[in-house]
Amino acid sequence: MNDKEYMRLALQLAKKGCGWTSPNPMVGDVVVKEGRIIGQGWHQRYGQAHAERNALASCTEDPQGATLYVTLEPCCHYGKQPPCVDAILDAGIHRVVVGSADPNPLVAGKGIAILRAHGIDVTENVLQEECDALNKVFFHYITTKRPFVSMKYAMTMDGKIATYTGASKWITGEIARNHVQRQRHRFRGIMVGVGTILADDPLLTCRIEGGRDPVRIICDTHLRTPLQSQVVMTAKQVPTILATCCGDPEKQAAYQQAGCRILCLEEHCGHVNLLQLMEQLGQEQIDSILLEGGGTLNWSALESGIVQQVQAYIAPKLFGGRDAKAPIEGAGVPLPDAAFRLKNSRLEQLGKDFLIESEVEYPCLPESWKKSEQ
């Protein structure tokens, strides 16, 4: 096996931490000595041992003189765990092969520099593209302090998310819906508008056995979420945040008694200020959000510049209907040249349905972001 093959194995190990390590990155390691794999590990849970220490602890023989393959630059600072560079030095590792550089300002090349200063041979950027993609959520969060937001919706081939009567169950098949459940496990938060609560009364949990429920975030400008809705009735079991502009303490108290948290935010164009909401959620270490909103919230999110990714699940069906809902509504753009453009698109077939996943490319920094930086 060569460097790339060992790094691919490290990537597969890293993915085992998906959904459990946030706001930390997913990291995998392989220890190789004289052409034999003698140890492997991954970062399993936030707050627990890092991948390097797990891999070294698993070694079946002395790792002195071995090569360590790691998907992300080893850390060199104290956090919930001690620096991984110390463990590498103590183990007598001869060579370290790194996939991604760590953009965390506390690391940012310092880990590699320390290893080289101690005479360790370091090879960088092996399968860098794949390693970077693995931690795109972490890279965004650690550099902006705001959650990575993925706008997710299911629609027909004529662009409808419901029929003209409002019926939407089900647009996609079981395989695609199970894929969505895995996304709910992966993302730290899930966000909808009050319109979705009023129309569908969803539970917004992860239905994968052993999966992690995301923090539920309801954008509800005037606190119209019914106290008998599923999200309120289960708020003591699943963390639930109501983001609102309503400052009425009596209204807020009813939700708080049910177990909901209230975030009272500024109003922006008649709705909750989404940029302010992202800043608050980022401070609470919510590093990623699956946006399952309706057309109004989705447009507001795009207009606010908070969306990094779009996940469109497309079913080979046609609904028609001039009044049938679309995934993105709002004011819209006036001309084709003003469109929000998508890049790095990926297509995946899920049973009879298709997932198109793309990154949002903003032509320039949105005005809302510019104002927030002043």
PLM feature segments, named:
Residues 2-8, 13-17, 22-24, 63, ...:
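Enzymes that bind and transform nitrogen-containing heteroaromatic metabolites
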Residues 105-106, 132, 298, 320:
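Generic structural signal for helix capping and beta-alpha/helix-loop junctions
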Residues 19-23, 112, 126-154:
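Proteins enriched for Cys/Gly/acidic motifs involved in redox and nucleic-acid/cofactor modification
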Residues 28:
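Helix-turn-helix
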Residues 59, 116-117, 142-144, 309, ...:
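Short alpha-helix boundary/capping motifs
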Residues 10-14, 23, 34-41, 130-143, ...:
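A short, flexible N-terminal coil/short beta segment enriched in small residues
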Residues 31-130, 215, 241, 246-248, ...:
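Zn2+-dependent cytidine deaminase-like catalytic core
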Residues 8, 12-15, 39, 50-53, ...:
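A broad detector of short, well-ordered amphipathic alpha-helices
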